[in-house]
């Protein structure tokens, strides 16, 4: 995974993730095979910030029903990226 845009898929925009932005913690959906080092390098390259630490979680897809048919959403990986104190915030999230 050499391209940083293949690692960082999209931001997670929830009430909890918005509250964590005050503490310079940003949440992203990332590729399932990406590790913490790859995620750190990708965020630093895309957003031009300094990353202090990365926490990752494997999220289990929810069971969904459509009438009598049962299906399941895909499993996905979530990363919470904490920026250093001297680093500026990520502009992508500022208007939300």
UniProtKB/Swiss-Prot annotation:
<keyword id="KW-0687">Ribonucleoprotein</keyword>
<keyword id="KW-0694">RNA-binding</keyword>
<comment type="subunit">
    <text>Part of the 50S ribosomal subunit. Contacts protein L29, and trigger factor when it is bound to the ribosome.</text>
</comment>
<dbReference type="GO" id="GO:1990904">
    <property type="term" value="C:ribonucleoprotein complex"/>
</dbReference>
<dbReference type="InterPro" id="IPR001014">
    <property type="entry name" value="Ribosomal_uL23_CS"/>
</dbReference>
<dbReference type="InterPro" id="IPR013025">
    <property type="entry name" value="Ribosomal_uL23-like"/>
</dbReference>
<dbReference type="GO" id="GO:0003735">
    <property type="term" value="F:structural constituent of ribosome"/>
</dbReference>
<dbReference type="GO" id="GO:0006412">
    <property type="term" value="P:translation"/>
</dbReference>
<protein>
    <recommendedName>
        <fullName>Large ribosomal subunit protein uL23</fullName>
    </recommendedName>
</protein>
<dbReference type="InterPro" id="IPR012678">
    <property type="entry name" value="Ribosomal_uL23/eL15/eS24_sf"/>
</dbReference>
<dbReference type="GO" id="GO:0019843">
    <property type="term" value="F:rRNA binding"/>
</dbReference>
<dbReference type="GO" id="GO:0005840">
    <property type="term" value="C:ribosome"/>
</dbReference>
<dbReference type="Pfam" id="PF00276">
    <property type="entry name" value="Ribosomal_L23"/>
</dbReference>
<comment type="function">
    <text>One of the early assembly proteins it binds 23S rRNA. One of the proteins that surrounds the polypeptide exit tunnel on the outside of the ribosome. Forms the main docking site for trigger factor binding to the ribosome.</text>
</comment>
<keyword id="KW-0699">rRNA-binding</keyword>
<comment type="similarity">
    <text>Belongs to the universal ribosomal protein uL23 family.</text>
</comment>
<keyword id="KW-0689">Ribosomal protein</keyword>
<dbReference type="InterPro" id="IPR012677">
    <property type="entry name" value="Nucleotide-bd_a/b_plait_sf"/>
</dbReference>
């Amino acid at each position: 995974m050499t391209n940083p845009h293949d690692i960082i898929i999209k931001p997670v925009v929830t009430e909890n993730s918005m509250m964590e932005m005050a503490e310079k913690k940003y949440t992203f959906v990332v590729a399932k095979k990406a590790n913490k080092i790859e995620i750190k390098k990708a965020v630093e390259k895309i957003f031009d910030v300094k990353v202090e630490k990365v926490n990752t979680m494997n999220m289990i897809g929810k069971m969904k029903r459509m009438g009598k048919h049962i299906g399941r959403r895909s499993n996905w990986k979530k990363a919470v990226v904490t920026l250093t104190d001297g680093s500026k915030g990520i502009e992508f999230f500022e208007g939300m």
